[in-house]
Structures are given as structure tokens and as C-alpha cells.
Amino acid sequence: VNSKQIRNFYINEEQSVYLLSHHDAKKHRQWLNICIKQLTLLGYSDVELIGSGAFGFVFAGIDDEGMPWVFKFSRITLAQSVRDRLEDEAYMLSQVHNPLVPKFYAFERIKKQGILMMERALGEDLEKISIKQGRFSAAKIMALALKLRNVLIDLREHKNGISPQPIVHGDIKPSNIVYDEQTNKLSLVDWGSSVYAQIDAEGNPVASNFMDLMSADISTTNARMGDVYFIGDEQMSGGQSSPRFDEQGVASTLYALASAQSCRFGAAVIPATSLNLPMELARVIDGMLSKNKATRDSAGDYFMRNMPTMAKAYLPELPRKLIRPYIPYWFSEFDEHPDTVVYSSRKQFLRQADHNQQLLDVNDAQLDRYYKEFLFDTGDTEKAFLASISRLAKYPVVGGLSFHWKENSLFVESSLILHDETLGTAFTDAINNTVMLAQGIEQKGLFKCCLFDARKTIQLERDGTGAFKFEHLPELDYEVMDVQASDVTRPHSYFEDGKDPDEQLQLPKKVIKCVFELNQIHHTGCIIFEALPDRMKIHHYYRLLDASKEPEFKRLLSKLMQYAVSITDVGVAGFMKLPYKNTREFDLCAKQADEFYPRDPKRILME
């Protein structure tokens, strides 16, 4: 299979363990158990996995004095040059002495395996808190802005002896900032992209001595790639490392948390000035996210200089206005928490027609992710829209969405079921962002996505001849919820929008005929066939809305599985059916209106 064929299958970046093949999932579990055993033998207790990324895994444990430690393991499957980065990270972390940065303890190498040991930052990362709470208040954003600005000052003022040697973190984003509510302590973690700055904030070369300046290659960069959803333009385009990189990371972080997004790209459509922040801070954040370098730098200088004064503003927590969701969703009556994954199709039109370049030799894990996730030739608003769809999959939600852009309007059809009522406010923020970003897209076209529970995914392995192996054919799972017939005036169809140009999998005619028969029964759901050379994954979510048809529905689902095993082609194809047509229409809107934190909050509190 060439890489292009599978590229359209777009799932949230931390792939669910339920989507790994049986062999890979087993290897994954064995490897985690080996790490836990190794750390337990070294005398640590309560060892647990607390995170994983492109480069490795992170464990936590308690030492014999009761102190919490963190252990970062590099993935041994990576190239040696990439594994060596963990040692570089250990060195950079050892250079930073700041109360907001976890202390470096040691770096060990056991055979090929590097292990970085450091103090544990207690609490929860801000991305997780943002998913639970939605938009951060003005007071929280202001307090965070001041703390991050103070860390940046410390990094800029780092010296080697008496010579200036500024440090760049290179990957400031919400998930790399850990907050402990009990102690009100903030920690900046993950120094894997950290380097010594090559140029200062003014763009002048940094050299510890005259000889360094003479020998420095001023055309190459030592910069590492941070998270492509948060880094600024200079870092993204391979510019020389500079303290400006971290200004950009801070601006992206403040913007993402204030707006309840998981990236920086939405700022043209949902500017900081629309997020109920104090006017001065909102304008500074928008300036720092500007496409114009001079504007960015001048806003960054203002931020660094004036943040302590700005932070003195009186910003009491005001009662949050009741925000209604722009599109409806329901809470599930079932207790189970789905492990949500999103599949989206028909993204082709979101790309910019004049950019067809493709980097085939992608050796950086972050860049690889950038290309896989379809971002390399889409505009910023389109990137933000796709990232907002990914953010929806961070909630325990199942269902489907369809966005149709025509002339001056956006039409949205949806069916969403959230499995946790405590997340209602935050999910409303997430879904409203998706709609506002969609209102800012000018291209005309159609975009659809399904959200399903990865735990229900059926996996069938192929034998040497390509035929599927199974003892008993698995069954497609479904729920039943009886809806009054009078509620169904305009049924929605699987075949509503014709053939999807993005999908390449040729399905047998009998599979399509079976879907056609299912279409006659009132239900909602999706089925996605992801056929790989060695196996097939069948992702699905079904909810029958007419209980009287259950025997027929069950019979057709069983038939569908029998026909699915005759698929020989490789690729992806899917069908989605919403419960009924309930189209919401929105005007297009290139930029949301200004909304600032009130000048006189006392008056509002007294009302």
C-alpha cells in the first residue's frame, strides 16, 4: 500500500490502543510491563505510566524517601540519533534552575535504553484541565501569562559564566504545563526541544566568546521542532533558534486556553479580542500571533515589558454567561465511557489549490504528524477547523457531523451523544468553536465526520493468501432507543451526498446493497471499513430508533459482516446516517465580534 492510500484515515494523534493490531497491542503491553518491572527492581514503588509521545514513554514512581520521581524512556525502535535526543534533553534540563521547572536528577543508559530521571511535576496538564473546564477565565489567563513571562525572562538571562547563553524551551503548549490545584504550583515540563539560542530577541548572534562567533555557522539552525499546532512561523520554517520561539509558544498557549481550542490556528476567525479578556491583554496576544513579523516582535516586547503591570488589574471571577450550543447534542442514558476516535472524509476541498507540494522524506516525528494530519497545504482557519474536530474526539462522545458550505451560508447537520454530563459546558465551548471556525471558511464544499468508540472496533487478520482469519464471525454492536414515529418527518440517508472522492476502497456490490437495505430502517450510525494489507478494521456505531424493526436490523447487520469478509481491496470507505434531517443554517463570518472583559467588574458583581 502506498502511504497516500491510507493517508485519508484521520484519527486523533494519540492513536487509541484499541486500534493497534493484536500483535502490536501485546508487544505494547509487554514493553510497559518490562519498564514497570525494571523501575520496581530499582527500588521505586507505585510505578505507573503517566504519558507517551512520538519519542517515548513517561512513568512515575516514589523513591524510598517518599519523593515522587518521573522516568522518561526513549523508544528503542527509533534511530540512534533520535534516541540520543533524550540525553540532550537531560543536559538542557540540568542547566535550568527555576521553581517552575522540575529538577533534573540523573540520566542512565541500560543497553540501548536511555532513561531520564527527574522530579515529578504534581497535578494535571492544562490541556486536560481545558478539556474538562472549557474556556479559561480572564483572571486565570492573566495569572498564567505573568508566570510564563517570568520563566521566559529567566531563560533569556541564563549565562555560561559571565557570557550570555539564553535557553529556548521550544515546545511551550498547554499539555507541557502542569498545574497542581492544591498548591497553586505551575511546572513547565518536556524539555525535549530545548536548545541554546543562536540569536537573541533582536536577531543578533549569541556567542559565549569571540571565537564562537568566528566559527559559528550563521546559516544553519540548531532548532528542534516543537508541536506543530503551537509553534510560530520562524520555528516551523527552520529559522535559527531564538527566545522569540518561546514568546510564540506562550502566545499560542494563552490563546488556546482562553478560547478552548487545541491549537493556535483559529486566531483570524476567533481573535483574542472576542474572548472576554481585558482589552490590553487581548490585543497583545493577537499581536503576538500576527502573520507580520514586526507586529509579532513588537507585541512580544510589549508583553515581556508590561506583563507585571497588566497583571495588577482587578479581575474578579464573574458569573459565566449561559452559553447555548450552536448545534444540539444529547446526554447518554448509558454509563459506559467510549474511547472516542474521529474519522473524517471529504477534506480535499479544504486544501489550497495552489499548494500541491509533498515532502516524501519526512524524518521528524512532529513533521510526520503534520503531513499525516492533512495540514501541510491547508490555510490556518482550515487547520483550526480540523483541529477542533480532533478536539471533539477528546470527549466521550459518539455520533456524526456534516458541514456543507454554499454561497453565503453554512449548513450543519448533526447527531451527537455525550457520555458525561459534567463535561457539558466544556463540550459546548468545543462544538461552538467548530461552528465558528467553519463559518470562517470560504471554500465551497462538504465535510463529514463520524465519532465512534474504538473499543467496539472489530479487527480481522488476513492469512498469507489475503483471506480473513476468524473462528466465529464477530457481530456489529448496536443500541436501541425507541423514538416516536411522529418525530421522523425527514429521514436522513446513507447516500445523501453521493460518492466520496477521498475514499479509495472498492466495496463489493453486496455490501453496498446491504447498506441500502439498512437505510430503509430508522436508525443512526456509521460504519467504516479500513482495509490494510495484513488486516481489516471495522469501526462502527449504531443506534436503532425503531424497536419494532430490531429482528430485521440485527439480520442485516449480521449479513453485512458476512459480506464484509469478501473485501479484497485496500483502502478506506465509510457510510454515515444521521437520525433525521435537522439542518442548522449559519451565516459565514470571517471574524467574530470583539467582546472584552468589562471595565467595571464591581458593578456587574453588585447587580
How would you name each of these model-derived features?
Residues 293-295, 301-318:
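Terminal C-lobe "cap" of eukaryotic-type protein kinase domains
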Residues 315-468:
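Regulatory extensions appended to serine/threonine kinase catalytic cores
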Residues 78-95:
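AlphaC helix of the eukaryotic protein kinase fold
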Residues 156-180:
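Catalytic-loop of the protein kinase fold
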Residues 111-125:
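Conserved short submotifs of the Hanks-type protein kinase catalytic core
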Residues 2-40:
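Juxta-kinase regulatory segment immediately upstream of eukaryotic protein kinase catalytic domains
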Residues 61-83:
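ATP-binding glycine-rich loop module of kinase domains
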Residues 107:
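Activation-segment/catalytic-loop signature of the eukaryotic protein kinase fold
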